[in-house]
Swiss-Prot record:
Disulphide connectivity of cysteines: C231-C316, C241-C270, C424-C437
Protein name: Fibrinogen beta chain
Compartments it resides in: Secreted
Function: Cleaved by the protease thrombin to yield monomers which, together with fibrinogen alpha (FGA) and fibrinogen gamma (FGG), polymerize to form an insoluble fibrin matrix. Fibrin has a major function in hemostasis as one of the primary components of blood clots. In addition, functions during the early stages of wound repair to stabilize the lesion and guide cell migration during re-epithelialization. Was originally thought to be essential for platelet aggregation, based on in vitro studies using anticoagulated blood.
Fibrinogen C-terminal domain span: 232-488
Keyword Coiled coil part of the UniProt annotation: yes
Annotated source species: Homo sapiens
Residues under site feature: Cleavage: R44, G45, K152, D153, K160, Q161, K163, D164
Assigned GO CC terms: blood microparticle; cell cortex; cell surface; collagen-containing extracellular matrix; endoplasmic reticulum; external side of plasma membrane; extracellular exosome; extracellular region
Length: 491
């Protein structure tokens, strides 16, 4: 391609030089004719036409030739016997011919002028035509020259693109070779090994699943009947734990209480050590062994394990995870002035508490409405003031005082919406006196380790065992308990 373009370019250049040489020859010849006209022709000769300044003359219509009679008949020639008259060449002519009969050798100026004029017209036309042809050829040559330069530039660009494409192809080829080598060395050789490992893991998991299924079946069989506490219960009893301590029950363990003679006695855990004792534990969280995400009736009646004897003693000296029951809590708090103590512990062992001098829970007809007052403590007044991290109406939405009790099947919270999915108890993991929604959530889901995130939560909400005024929304307590006792002046 490059050789062909170079040969065509050389050929056009040679043709251009030949045409320019031919034009110069005709111009010189034409100039010589004009010079002779100026030196020898009379005023009757034509004037050269300046095409740039003058218009070409137009031919006028010629009149018809004159008709009619002409000369009379020529006289008869003289006889041959007559004496030949010698003709003498006129002076106007040039040199004489060697034979006198042939006359003048050179023509006169008028004859030469006329002959030249007869030849000048076709030559002039030819010269004009050649000039036009030369100009057209020159323009064509210039266009061809420019086109050839354009082709040359395009060809050079194409050559560069081809070279760049070759480099890209080489790079991709090298990359493909590397990938092919990697596949051959790693994937093809490792896949069989990985498959064997996965088969081994699968078999191991299958055996573990079978063992778990066996354990679950045994546990389900064991839990077909309600769990019973196999430990001794003290003989001393009373209306609540405060009356028991006054009767001499001084150890913290499980007791039987009977607030009213119309109800059967029931088990509670009495804390006889904290702040002079006499506390009836109505709620306790410590290890996540009991699910607090329950319906209205279980919260009404109570659930969980009141106490355990895992310390090796013959009595239940340690509290379990349980909720005493809303009916029982309501009855105990409506017997007289009652105080509430909420204790909590984080996963580092740090402890805080919130004490309320007044605490009352209404009956079921009033949806177990809560009332608290007279706060003191180190945990922060979450029940009365709401979450300290929030401001304005957002904080007001987290106040629990005065709220009704809610479970996921009985929506009594302060989140007023037509969407049944937007329910605090359903999103926050337990039954509680929710507003919209909480600053405290003692009955929430139990998270090991304390810190948890929204993607760990079932609904993406802060549904842990939370007390926002101490640890914020995304920290679930290790332990939390709620204890009540009749209010009396301390000595």
């Amino acid at each position: 391609m490059k050789r062909m373009v170079s040969w065509s370019f050389h050929k056009l250049k040679t043709m251009k030089h030949l045409l320019l040489l031919l034009l110069c020859v005709f111009l010189v010849k034409s100039q010589g004719v004009n010079d002779n006209e100026e030196g020898f022709f009379s005023a009757r000769g034509h004037r050269p036409l300046d095409k740039k300044r003058e218009e070409a003359p137009s031919l006028r219509p010629a009149p018809p030739p004159i008709s009619g009679g002409g000369y009379r008949a020529r006289p008869a020639k003289a006889a041959a016997t007559q004496k030949k008259v010698e003709r003498k060449a006129p002076d106007a002519g040039g040199c004489l011919h060697a034979d006198p009969d042939l006359g003048v050798l050179c023509p006169t100026g008028c004859q030469l002028q006329e002959a030249l004029l007869q030849q000048e017209r076709p030559i002039r036309n030819s010269v004009d035509e050649l000039n036009n042809n030369v100009e057209a050829v020159s323009q064509t040559s210039s266009s061809s020259f420019q086109y050839m330069y354009l082709l040359k530039d395009l060809w050079q660009k194409r050559q560069k693109q081809v070279k760049d494409n070759e480099n890209v192809v080489n790079e991709y080829s090298s990359e493909l070779e590397k990938h092919q080598l990697y596949i051959d060395e790693t994937v093809n050789s490792n896949i069989p090994t990985n498959l064997r490992v996965l088969r081994s893991i699968l078999e191991n998991l299958r055996s573990k699943i079978q063992k778990l299924e066996s354990d679950v079946s045994a546990q389900m069989e064991y839990c077909r009947t309600p769990c019973t506490v196999s430990c001794n219960i003290p003989v001393v009893s009373g209306k609540e734990c405060e009356e028991i301590i006054r009767k001499g029950g001084e150890t913290s363990e499980m007791y039987l209480i009977q607030p009213d003679s119309s109800v059967k006695p029931y088990r509670v855990y009495c804390d006889m050590n904290t702040e002079n004792g006499g506390w009836t534990v109505i709620q306790n969280r410590q290890d996540g062994s009991v699910d607090f995400g329950r319906k209205w009736d279980p919260y009404k009646q109570g659930f969980g394990n009141v106490a355990t004897n895992t310390d090796g003693k013959n009595y239940c000296g340690l509290p379990g995870e349980y909720w005493l029951g809303n009916d029982k809590i309501s009855q105990l708090t409506r017997m007289g002035p009652t105080e509430l103590l909420i204790e909590m512990e984080d996963w580092k062992g740090d402890k805080v508490k919130a004490h309320y001098g007044g605490f009352t829970v209404q009956n079921e007809a009033n949806k177990y409405q809560i009332s608290v007052n007279k706060y003191r403590g180190t945990a922060g007044n979450a029940l009365m003031d709401g979450a300290s991290q929030l401001m304005g109406e957002n904080r007001t939405m987290t106040i629990h005082n005065g709220m009704f009790f809610s479970t996921y099947d009985r929506d009594n919270d302060g989140w007023l919406t037509s969407d049944p999915r937007k329910q605090c108890s359903k999103e926050d993991g337990g039954g509680w006196w929710y507003n919209r929604c909480h600053a405290a959530n003692p009955n929430g889901r139990y998270y090991w380790g304390g810190q948890y995130t929204w993607d760990m939560a079932k609904h993406g909400t802060d549904d842990g065992v939370v007390w926002m005024n101490w640890k914020g929304s995304w920290y679930s307590m290790r332990k939390m308990s709620m204890k009540i006792r009749p209010f009396f002046p301390q000595q």
